């Protein structure tokens, strides 16, 4: 097998289209039992604290409920609210039996007002009953590789077998934010709709949306056993970071601090530029390969980036601090 490897240190910074100015001081102190900050595009973990602890997640469960519903339902379909969707314990938009709701409106009630009744109505609309919908939710998270997450309901009310980790939840959110409909919903400060002639106004419970211009999502949560939970997202210079804090009293303050510190510490850098050429020689024949889409990562001043080409399998392997991070396909363009 023919392989060529090389190490890219801080010289890589010159390849970036973004000016690099690493921060001298960042503050990662926080009160969370578990926390994780992740880059949405690459999935790189930028900060972690007990990120693999299995913990209750409260209403951050609804992130999964929302993306599963978005991917499996016609959002313009109208449903009639049934008796078993009314009077659900906890936060609610106060659905009434017989009301006619568009699925899209239920999603806003779910994510902005954290309606447990909306979660039940969506589960029934998508899968016919709660059990089948929860099964679909569990299949969804397992397909993403989130093996430390298990769900028993669509709303997050406490159950000892209902849990996630900060890492899993960050990974789920990075996936969900790739969906434009999901992103639009969770970044909305307010949403109005008309239900059977009555105007409903949903105001988002995510306080960071009002106090921090970088914030663009996602979801709050609270139960006595889970404590205060929050998943926040923020963007700057085409970077979007996701932060999960579980059982964290000052959840908004800690989330903003953690994301701000990561935005200061890490800068997007092209590890491999778009249309980068790789040359190999086989029996004196010159073989030229190209990567069609550049590969970039948030990196900090201490990172070691190692790139290895595997021409036999037409792959480029990217190592971050000596651990394999990703593999990228390359194409032969001449022979």
Language-model features: where?
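Active-site-adjacent loops and short helices of periplasmic peptidoglycan-processing enzymes
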Residues: 21-167, 171-180
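Sec-dependent N-terminal signal peptides of Gram-positive bacterial secreted proteins and lipoproteins
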Residues: 2-23
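Domain-terminus/edge residues, biased toward the C-terminal soluble/receptor-binding domains
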Residues: 146-147, 158-335
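Hydrophobic alpha-helical segments, especially transmembrane helices
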Residues: 3-4, 63, 236
């Amino acid at each position: 097998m023919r392989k060529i490897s090389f190490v890219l240190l801080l010289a890589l910074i010159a390849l970036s289209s973004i000016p690099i100015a690493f921060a001298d001081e960042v503050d990662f102190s926080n009160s969370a039992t578990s926390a994780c900050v992740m880059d949405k595009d690459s999935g790189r973990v930028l900060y972690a604290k007990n990120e693999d602890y299995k913990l209750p997640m409260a209403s951050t469960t609804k992130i999964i409920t929302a993306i599963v519903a978005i991917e499996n339902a016609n959002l313009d379909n109208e449903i009639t609210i049934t008796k078993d969707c009314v009077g659900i314990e906890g936060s609610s938009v106060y659905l009434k039996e017989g009301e006619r709701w568009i699925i899209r409106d239920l999603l806003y009630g779910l994510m902005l007002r954290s309606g447990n009744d909306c979660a039940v109505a969506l589960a029934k609309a998508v899968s016919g009953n709660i059990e089948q919908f929860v099964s679909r939710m569990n299949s969804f998270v397992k397909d993403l590789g989130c093996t430390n997450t298990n769900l028993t309901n669509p709303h997050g009310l406490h159950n000892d077998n209902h849990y996630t980790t900060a890492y899993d939840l960050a990974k789920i959110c990075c996936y969900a934010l790739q969906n434009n409909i999901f992103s639009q919903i969770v970044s909305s400060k307010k949403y109005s709709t008309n239900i059977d002639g009555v105007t409903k106004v949903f105001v988002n419970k995510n306080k960071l949306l009002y106090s921090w211009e970088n914030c663009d999502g996602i979801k709050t949560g609270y139960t006595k056993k889970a404590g205060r939970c929050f998943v926040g997202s923020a963007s700057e210079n085409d970077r979007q970071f996701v932060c999960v804090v579980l059982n964290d009293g000052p959840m908004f303050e800690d989330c903003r601090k953690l994301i701000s510190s990561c935005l200061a510490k890490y800068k997007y850098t092209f590890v491999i530029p778009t249309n980068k050429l790789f040359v190999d020689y086989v029996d004196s024949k010159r073989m030229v390969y190209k990567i069609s889409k550049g590969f970039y990562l948030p990196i900090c001043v201490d990172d070691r980036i190692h790139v290895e080409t595997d021409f036999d399998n037409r792959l480029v392997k990217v190592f971050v601090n000596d651990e394999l991070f990703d593999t990228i396909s390359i194409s032969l363009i001449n022979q």
